[in-house]
Amino acid sequence: NSVHPCCDPVKCEPREGEHCISGPCCRNCYFLRAGTVCKRAVGDDVDDYCSGITPDCPRNRYKGKED
């Protein structure tokens, strides 16, 4: 049974000093820089970007026909 390198095995939370365990805006236990593309545009939509403060990929406000 292997433990995720970013996870405190007792609490199953990010280890002290680290930001995240997984997600499209998490790499090597840290949030990706704000403005990093986390989802490329499809159709007439626009790219989604990491916020720099969460491991999730926030949806942009513009919704194309594909959304």
Curated annotation (Swiss-Prot):
GO terms for molecular function: toxin activity. It holds the Pfam family Disintegrin. Disulfide bonds join 6-29, 20-26, 25-50, 38-57. Its main location: secreted. Expressed by the venom gland. It is found in: Secreted. Keywords: Cell adhesion, Cell adhesion impairing toxin, Disulfide bond, Secreted, Toxin. One of its GO terms (cellular component) is extracellular region. One of its GO terms (biological process) is cell adhesion. A motif (Cell attachment site) lies at residues 42-44. Residues 1-65 form the Disintegrin domain. InterPro entries: Disintegrin_CS (IPR018358), Disintegrin_dom (IPR001762), Disintegrin_dom_sf (IPR036436). Negative results: does not inhibit alpha-V/beta-3 (ITGAV/ITGB3) integrin. The disintegrin belongs to the dimeric disintegrin subfamily. Inhibits adhesion of cells expressing alpha-4/beta-1 (ITGA4/ITGB1) and alpha-4/beta-7 (ITGA4/ITGB7) integrins to the natural ligands vascular cell adhesion molecule 1 (VCAM-1) and mucosal addressin cell adhesion molecule 1 (MADCAM-1). It is also a weaker inhibitor of alpha-5/beta-1 (ITGA5/ITGB1) and alpha-2b/beta-3 (ITGA2B/ITGB3) integrins. The inhibitory activity of EC3 towards alpha-4 integrins is associated with the MLD sequence of EC3B subunit. The ability of EC3 to inhibit ITGA5/ITGB1 resides in both subunits A and B. Heterodimer with EC3B; disulfide-linked. Belongs to the venom metalloproteinase (M12B) family. P-II subfamily. P-IIe sub-subfamily. This is Disintegrin EC3A. The lineage of its organism: Eukaryota, Metazoa, Chordata, Craniata, Vertebrata.
